Amino acid sequence: PMDFIIGGQKNIGRGWQMLVSCLGAGRGISLPALGVSTSQVAFKSASEYAAVREQFGLAIGQFEGIQEKLADIAGKTYLQEAMRVLTTEGLGMGLKPSVVTAIAKYHMTELGRDVLDSAMDIQAGKAIQNGPQNTLASGYVAQPIAITVEGANILTRNLMIFGQGVMRCHPYLQSMVESIHSEDKGADKEFNGILRKTIGYSTANSLRAFRLGVLPFTASANSALPEVREYEKAVHKLSAKLAVYADFSLLVLGGKLKQAEMLSARLGDVMSFLYAAMASIKYYEQKVASSEREQAAPYFHYATRFAL
């Protein structure tokens, strides 16, 4: 029957479009939530184990090697929670940020894998013995599923994050491509206007990056919190440099940028970690109560420095 088709007759042949549309939002909810929940469980399990397990008459949590792993777990778990909150807030506002959800899916599942590996290292022999007392093994076995589904992570990093992001986020690039393929009489005039704007935009990016490179103290910061201001300045300086590298890559490679997967992936990494740093800053400013900031500060500093 026709009413078995989602949306009825007018949606015949649009199944793939509907699926991709749902994927863009869905991968920003389920898999990032799985990544951060995995990290939270691993953090709790590893820290409790480090407190009760003894070696040479001392709790293993007193050894610096274990402390280093626990600090890494704690900082990355904070960063994941900050990214989860920022991403879902955007989705809750009705936005469909497909590039942002790709960033969240890739980096939060990878961070979840890193955290779980560190927790397994801490629990050592206990972590590799299956049974009801093993709180990590089932998550360790299931983690490759999160890495694979809704866009395998290799594909997401190499093709989707920057390959799609540069087209969607550039203020003029998409309009320029549309004008090139347009058959309207005024398409040439429109293209010339967009080209002038693009050149002006790239020139402004280059001058801004040069100014911040030579005079780094001129970087702006809006936060009232002194511990946040230096990170805001670092984000502004790095974003200016990324804009120049992205423009230069587009100028040299053009449409072949997607085929230069290693370059696209590295540029995507920079963009992704800038997003992670902004998420960490926003979470610390807006979600952490003033009375709790002193306790949260070590997590915030570790997570933001890791992202930058």
Report the location of each language-model feature:
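Flavin-dependent oxidoreductase catalytic core characteristic
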Residues: 1-308
